């Protein structure tokens, strides 16, 4: 592994860890606000209308919550697209040998949680739409837990989690594209296609000016928003179209990644957590705790994730499809697989897509399951990592 890649991973881990702490603070703050005398102000804040108009051509009128989920999260997904592309070209999944082990683990971590959710909710048709919620891994929280253990965690284990989470994000993107698009508009899709062609041409000619990608990207985002396809996919496309190498030895991808990453970690994701984690607990009794929806999400994260990630990882090695990275063992892989049950922001995002956001009881049940499953996964995962990395601490 080159020094450049090591430095890139180090900076990424530090940024995600700090962001994870902020996510926790803003999430707790959201729950406090939603259950305090200020709850009416909290929900009024979320539903406050925000209007952006460009003459008579475009008018976007949405509540603040939707601007956060459709707008700010699109910027986050630009970062996801940039990270996935970078890792595919020069990083942790840049070759078959590097990618196959975390890729198989990620597949298990998506398939088994969805299956667990479906088994719990198969008798309740109204809940079927939430099957994708426990598939996601929140890389900020997961990396944050890893960083708490410092140097006792092997670099190979950190790289494994990073690669797995990135492939997991890619899976979430595919799920959003295939299952959460509706009422498609042909005109908007044509305009979006033209914008995509524009981005591809910018990439083809290795244009280094990031403003060009921002301008065409905004056109793409508005078009996708109007098309019926979820607007965050525009962010991913923008990220994929920024070239790794530009003219005059410039690095547009790295430049844009460094420009967006602090905003994503310290503003966008904390704001998303604050707007989506506020669950009014006063109206939730045993019915909420024992609901198949809540249980399906909780068990999907707590059991489905570790079983899927570990089982697929173990079988891939035993069947000689992949090799266990040097310096780590299956006990540590299992500990990381439990950490993958921290779904949080990505799971919250998928819940808002599945059940329409807002403060409806389906969304509240899903969020309750996400908070419980993610919290227990974080605590148990930390303890398992602490136990399984004792030898590293003694060296």
UniProtKB/Swiss-Prot annotation:
<keyword id="KW-0472">Membrane</keyword>
<dbReference type="Pfam" id="PF06965">
    <property type="entry name" value="Na_H_antiport_1"/>
</dbReference>
<keyword id="KW-0739">Sodium transport</keyword>
<feature type="transmembrane region" description="Helical">
    <location>
        <begin position="18"/>
        <end position="38"/>
    </location>
</feature>
<keyword id="KW-0812">Transmembrane</keyword>
<dbReference type="GO" id="GO:0005886">
    <property type="term" value="C:plasma membrane"/>
</dbReference>
<feature type="transmembrane region" description="Helical">
    <location>
        <begin position="295"/>
        <end position="315"/>
    </location>
</feature>
<feature type="transmembrane region" description="Helical">
    <location>
        <begin position="205"/>
        <end position="225"/>
    </location>
</feature>
<dbReference type="InterPro" id="IPR004670">
    <property type="entry name" value="NhaA"/>
</dbReference>
<protein>
    <recommendedName>
        <fullName>Na(+)/H(+) antiporter NhaA</fullName>
    </recommendedName>
</protein>
<dbReference type="InterPro" id="IPR023171">
    <property type="entry name" value="Na/H_antiporter_dom_sf"/>
</dbReference>
<keyword id="KW-1133">Transmembrane helix</keyword>
<feature type="transmembrane region" description="Helical">
    <location>
        <begin position="160"/>
        <end position="180"/>
    </location>
</feature>
<keyword id="KW-1003">Cell membrane</keyword>
<feature type="transmembrane region" description="Helical">
    <location>
        <begin position="100"/>
        <end position="120"/>
    </location>
</feature>
<feature type="transmembrane region" description="Helical">
    <location>
        <begin position="266"/>
        <end position="286"/>
    </location>
</feature>
<feature type="transmembrane region" description="Helical">
    <location>
        <begin position="182"/>
        <end position="202"/>
    </location>
</feature>
<dbReference type="GO" id="GO:0015385">
    <property type="term" value="F:sodium:proton antiporter activity"/>
</dbReference>
<keyword id="KW-0050">Antiport</keyword>
<keyword id="KW-0997">Cell inner membrane</keyword>
<comment type="similarity">
    <text>Belongs to the NhaA Na(+)/H(+) (TC 2.A.33) antiporter family.</text>
</comment>
<feature type="transmembrane region" description="Helical">
    <location>
        <begin position="333"/>
        <end position="353"/>
    </location>
</feature>
<keyword id="KW-0813">Transport</keyword>
<dbReference type="GO" id="GO:0006885">
    <property type="term" value="P:regulation of pH"/>
</dbReference>
<feature type="transmembrane region" description="Helical">
    <location>
        <begin position="129"/>
        <end position="149"/>
    </location>
</feature>
<keyword id="KW-0915">Sodium</keyword>
<feature type="transmembrane region" description="Helical">
    <location>
        <begin position="64"/>
        <end position="84"/>
    </location>
</feature>
<comment type="function">
    <text>Na(+)/H(+) antiporter that extrudes sodium in exchange for external protons.</text>
</comment>
<feature type="transmembrane region" description="Helical">
    <location>
        <begin position="226"/>
        <end position="246"/>
    </location>
</feature>
<keyword id="KW-0406">Ion transport</keyword>
<feature type="transmembrane region" description="Helical">
    <location>
        <begin position="368"/>
        <end position="388"/>
    </location>
</feature>
């Amino acid at each position: 592994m080159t020094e450049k890649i090591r430095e890139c991973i180090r900076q990424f881990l530090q940024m995600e860890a700090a962001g994870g702490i902020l996510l926790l603070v803003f999430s707790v703050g959201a729950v406090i606000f939603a259950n305090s005398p200020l709850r009416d102000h909290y929900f009024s804040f979320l539903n406050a209308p925000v209007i952006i108009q460009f003459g008579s051509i475009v008018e976007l009128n949405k509540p603040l919550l939707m601007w956060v989920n459709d707008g700010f999260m699109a910027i986050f997904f630009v970062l996801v697209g940039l990270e996935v592309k970078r890792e595919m070209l020069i990083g942790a999944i840049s070759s078959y040998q590097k990618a196959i082990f975390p890729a198989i683990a990620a597949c298990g971590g998506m398939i088994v949680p969805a299956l667990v959710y479906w088994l719990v909710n198969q008798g309740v048709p109204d809940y079927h739409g939430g099957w994708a919620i426990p598939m996601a891994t929140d890389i900020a929280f997961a990396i944050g837990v890893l960083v708490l253990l410092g140097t006792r965690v092997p670099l190979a284990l950190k790289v494994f989690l990073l690669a797995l989470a990135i492939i997991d994000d890619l899976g979430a993107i595919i799920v959003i594209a295939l299952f959460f698009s509706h009422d498609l508009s042909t005109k908007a899709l044509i305009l979006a296609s033209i914008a995509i062609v524009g981005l591809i041409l910018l990439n083809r000619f290795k244009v280094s000016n990031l403003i060009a990608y921002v301008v065409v990207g905004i056109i793409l985002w508005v078009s996708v928003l109007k098309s019926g396809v979820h607007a965050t996919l525009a962010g991913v496309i923008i990220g994929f179209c920024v070239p790794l190498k530009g003219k005059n030895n410039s690095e547009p991808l790295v430049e844009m990644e460094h420009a967006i990453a602090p905003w994503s970690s310290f503003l966008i994701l904390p704001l998303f957590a604050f707007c989506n984690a506020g669950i009014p607990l006063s109206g939730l009794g045993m019915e909420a705790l024992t609901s198949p929806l809540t249980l399906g999400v909780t068990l999907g994260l707590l059991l489905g994730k570790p079983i899927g990630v570990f089982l697929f990882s173990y079988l891939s090695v035993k069947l000689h499809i992949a090799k266990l990275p040097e310096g780590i063992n299956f006990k540590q892989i299992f500990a990381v697989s439990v950490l993958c049950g921290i779904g949080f922001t990505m799971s919250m995002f998928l819940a808002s897509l599945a059940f329409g956001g807002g403060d409806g009881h389906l969304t509240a049940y899903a969020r309750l399951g996400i908070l419980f499953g993610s919290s227990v996964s974080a605590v148990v995962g930390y303890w398992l990592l602490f136990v399984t990395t004792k030898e590293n601490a003694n060296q």
